[in-house]
Every structure is written in structure tokens, then in C-alpha cells.
Amino acid sequence: MPKNNNDYDDIFKTLKYNHKRLFISLINKAFNKSYPLNIVPTILPTDSYIENPDTDKIEERESDLLMSICGDTYLIECQSYEDGTMAIRIAEYAFLSARNNAVWENGRVILNMPAYVVVYIKSSEHTPLYTEISLKFPNGESVNYDCKNILLKDISKEDMISDRLFPYIPFYITRYENEICNKGNIDSALSDLLYFRTELTKLYQNNELSPEELLDIMNYINRIIKHIADGNEYEERMVSIMGGTVEETPSQ
């Protein structure tokens, strides 16, 4: 499989459309909320168009996840690496969200900015711990619009299961990218895959995951494995743990 970081975005976005309820636990953890897990969140439109001042062309902007739960709006960006543009992109996405949901009152507009978080699938010593946006106004007032970033490498497999952080699970295996790509020792990776298969199956048996959710998560794990291994000798051995190679997930 060609190395294309859009593969990560595609899986994250597919999860939000096919299994949006799985994001409730993620939002509860990221934003210190306690929404019931049986409520139905609303996926808000994320595509807007902005004129690029450098090219004078109209470009589409689409955030990874914009979701409304009980009247609260959340923006989540899934980033494979730091490219120096995340803060300005968040500012654009957040303003577009606020504009699309603006409240108009006789010459006055109220812009409700969403709470946001950036999730780094892969990270290094250079990955910022915070995304910081400062809004400065002509009257001298300044508003900070910041968040603490989530680094996936800091979340253990046990916490992903106990906190029901299902959207993170397909990307867990990226922490072994160096070993997989360079044909190093993958015993720990194999052990972790077995752990996820066992624990996800238990959650299915306890009716916490539907058959489609279980199989889709496992197949998304395999897509990430295939992305990393790119057909090397480890690929077949690793994907077999989750049930072999599947090109389409059950929800598709």
C-alpha cells in the first residue's frame, strides 16, 4: 500500500460517519464530560470554502470531526505529524463552525466557538504539547483559545479499553512503525494485537459493541498494519490476528 498519511484521516472520518456513538467516550475523556453513552450525537457539516490569498483560488476546507452533543459543539482534529499549520487550521475550522451556527440579533452576531482538541497519531520530541491561538482586537483586548494536545503514544492499550476510546484503537499499532518497517522485533506488537482482539471480543459479548462495530474496528486495525508494513513479511502474520485481510468493512 502506498505510504499516504491520508489513510489515517480516511479511517478517522469513516469512523465518524459509520460509528459516531463511539466518539462519545472519547469526548467525555478529552473534555472532562459525562455524556450518557446511549445518546445519539449529531455530525455537523465540516466543509467550507476559503479564498487562498497566494493563488486567488477557492479552496475547500474540511475538518476531521465536528460533532454536537446535547447542544455542545466539539472539534477534533486527527494529525499524523506536526506540520506547523495546525493552529491556523483550527482557527479557520472553528470560525467557520461558529459562522455556520451564528446567532443573529438586530445588528449583533454571537459566534459560539467549539471546544477543540488535536490528536497526534504519531509524535516526537518536537510535537507541541499545546495548540495555542491568540485573538487580538484593536481595542487591546486579547483572548486565548488553547487546548492541550493528545499524544496517542501516551495512552496505554489498557486505558484505551477501560476508557472505551475506540476511535484511537486502530492507530495504536503506529507506535511500532519503526520495528515493522525495519523488520525488527515485533513480539510486543503481536502481543498487543492479541490483547485488543481478546478485549474487543469481550466487549462485544457484553453487548458494548455491535457486530459491525467490532468487525470494523478490527478491519481498521488491519488497514493501518497494511499501510505501515506495505506488503513486507510481517504483514500477513499481523493482520491474521484480527481475522485476515478485508478490503471492505461490514458497515460499508
Where are these regions (language model features)?
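Coupling/switch segment of ABC-type P-loop NTPase heads
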Residues: 161-188
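Charge-rich, low-complexity amphipathic helices
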Residues: 34-37, 44-50, 98, 172, ...
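Accessory alpha/beta interaction modules
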Residues: 1-167, 252
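Alpha-helical structural elements
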Residues: 3, 7, 44, 88, ...
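Short, charged alpha-helical interaction segments and adjacent helix-coil junctions
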Residues: 68-80, 103, 183-252
